[in-house]
């Protein structure tokens, strides 16, 4: 079974990690679990001010800030995962990655923003 777990460092994605960790053995024998971080692209004007290498390092550093605590938590639970990060629209990129894997299951939080921002901006899961 291939499971995609999009995370963003929010308490909602922490809940999805706890769900995966507590039920990993119920999700099939040796499930393949991929953690996915989707980062919003920097505005074009800002991105033009730095080199492509610097921009890629920035995205890698931002993704690592999200992966590191997730990786540490899942390791303590004995859950092995692969990791991927993509830059773009979260809903679009999650759907693309789910198709590419192909994922049998997507486990993700219902919100990733603060409640107030979610009220005005919506959510990827909406």
PLM feature spans:
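Active-site-adjacent beta-strand anchor residues
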Residues: 6, 84, 109
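Gly/Ser-rich helix-loop-strand patches that form or flank binding pockets
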Residues: 96-126
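Small/aliphatic-rich secondary-structure junction motif
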Residues: 1-52
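Phosphate- and divalent-cation-binding pockets in alpha/beta enzyme and binding domains
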Residues: 15, 93, 115
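A short acidic, glycine-rich active-site loop
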Residues: 53-65
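Class I S-adenosyl-L-methionine
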Residues: 21, 64, 68-75
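Structural beta-alpha unit
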Residues: 72-106
């Amino acid at each position: 079974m291939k499971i995609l777990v999009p995370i963003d460092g929010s308490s909602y994605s922490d809940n999805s990690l706890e769900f995966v960790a507590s039920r990993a053995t119920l999700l099939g024998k040796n499930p393949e679990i991929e953690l996915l971080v989707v980062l919003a692209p920097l505005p074009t004007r800002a991105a033009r001010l730095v080199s492509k290498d610097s921009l890629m390092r920035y995205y890698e550093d931002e993704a690592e800030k999200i992966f590191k605590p997730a990786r540490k938590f899942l390791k303590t639970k004995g859950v092995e995962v692969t990791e991927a990060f993509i830059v773009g629209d979260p809903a679009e990129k999650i759907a693309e990655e789910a198709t590419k894997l192909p994922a049998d299951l997507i486990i993700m939080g219902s919100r990733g923003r603060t409640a107030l921002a979610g009220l005005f901006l919506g959510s990827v899961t909406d």
